[in-house]
Amino acid sequence: MRVNLLITMIIFALIWPVTALRAAVSKTTWADAPAREFVFVENNSDDNFFVTPGGALDPRLTGANRWTGLKYTGSGTIYQQSLGYIDNGYNTGLYTNWKFDMWLENSPVSSPLTGLRCINWYAGCNMTTSLILPQTTDASGFYGATVTSGGAKWMHGMLSDAFYQYMQQMPVGSSFTMTINACQTSVNYDASSGARCKDQASGNWYVRNVTHTKAANLRLINTHSLAEVFINSDGVPTLGEGNADCRTQTIGSRSGLSCKMVNYTLQTNGLSNTSIHIFPAIANSSLASAVGAYDMQFSLNGSSWKPVSNTAYYYTFNEMKSADSIYVFFSSNFFKQMVNLGISDINTKDLFNFRFQNTTSPESGWYEFSTSNTLIIKPRDFSISIISDEYTQTPSREGYVGSGESALDFGYIVTTSGKTAADEVLIKVTGPAQVIGGRSYCVFSSDDGKAKVPFPATLSFITRNGATKTYDAGCDDSWRDMTDALWLTTPWTDISGEVGQMDKTTVKFSIPMDNAISLRTVDDNGWFGEVSASGEIHVQATWRNIN
């Protein structure tokens, strides 16, 4: 009996390891991936980030953290079709209805991944997000993403904002190494209860070390600079108020206006790259069809120019290393076609943008960014504009509430242009408001919305007789008449011989900080801390009996 028992135990001991091997995922540890370089784009104009390969694509670290105007929505040309993601370099396919985990060891940041990346227009992917949500995430990765049927899916993990923020602060030339774990299984486990792919009875688990070096940092600077451009019926531009770097210019046989539209800094570790292309593109398809390639041109130095024609002309990464600005030239015919198409009172940020294409990464190499400066383009016949006297789109102020505290003052320049002076000019202030005791007040709120504090506000300007006229204007969305302001008149003559005039005046919007009512909330409670508000100032002009 003792012998039989011993034999039974030996057989058991031999069989047990074999049984355990058959009841586990197949783990493959790949050799370390070759180190790769990336270019990081810090977009302060649009408040987002973009990362793109500086050389070879795989292992992948590529794409933006936000959608741009190039996002594919189901029709038209396919440009941006997913947000940013990583992989281990093998671009391994996933099986439909299997579950997938991806997690990082030695991750440079906590919570680096949000889920399974997919191409947004492929069947089974989310067109809005390009993301298949997992059952759960943690500080290392995500778990339990079900691979949907339809288009192909791969072992790609979508990058979190925290990952982009880490890359933003990395010095150029520095590197990080991480271990990417990617595991898929047909077992229907519950990741939200703690189960993981690597612990299941079957599946495939891949492990690989990858290293990425920050080879360059391109910082797009939002200068907030603003300028007005008035155009006549023949497209001839006239510069109005503003501080954008613009000048009239002739290039070849074309006359028009050139402006510095993008300001940037580019730091590199010596990276050489010609696959990254940057060029402008007109957003309005009718205008893009109406103008010729040389009616809009762009330059890195303001003297050597390239025409705008889809992807045909561009500046490479290597060319951008020797500059810090991008200039754009608009011919008179460009403006004339705008007039013909009825495109007026438009902001250049709505008219065109710059595109970024990395031909190395076709699925995630497309990106779009706005200009650093803004032009407000208006017709010279019968138009009105208002801009901050600081020539910025979003002037802001801050201060303290209490006796003797200074008001928050905002200065503006109002311009009308027409064959004659406007017969009527009106102005109003809009924003959060509340009527207290029969008077309208602008309402400032705390971040949590619990404290709402009333502030009086006024509009004032100098009249023709030299007096100051002041209106109570508590963000109440009501028009006030400023026709009798002191206007500075500049005559103009159109190319056709017609004459007209441009009239300018200034107006001040003021929010007193020393009014006793602002010491308490609209509910008559005391308050402490910070409150804020934003609003808009609108103007309109009327011309009557114009032939």
From Swiss-Prot:
One of its GO terms (cellular component) is pilus. Keywords: Fimbrium, Signal. Induction: Negatively regulated by H-NS. Positively regulated by IHF and EcpR. Residues 1-23 form the signal peptide. It is found in: Fimbrium. It comes from the Bacteria. Belongs to the EcpD/MatE family. Part of the ecpRABCDE operon, which encodes the E.coli common pilus (ECP). ECP is found in both commensal and pathogenic strains and plays a dual role in early-stage biofilm development and host cell recognition. Tip pilus adhesin, which is required for assembly of EcpA into fibers. Forms polymers. Interacts with EcpA. Not expressed under classical laboratory conditions, but is functional when constitutively expressed. This is Fimbria adhesin EcpD. The gene is ecpD.
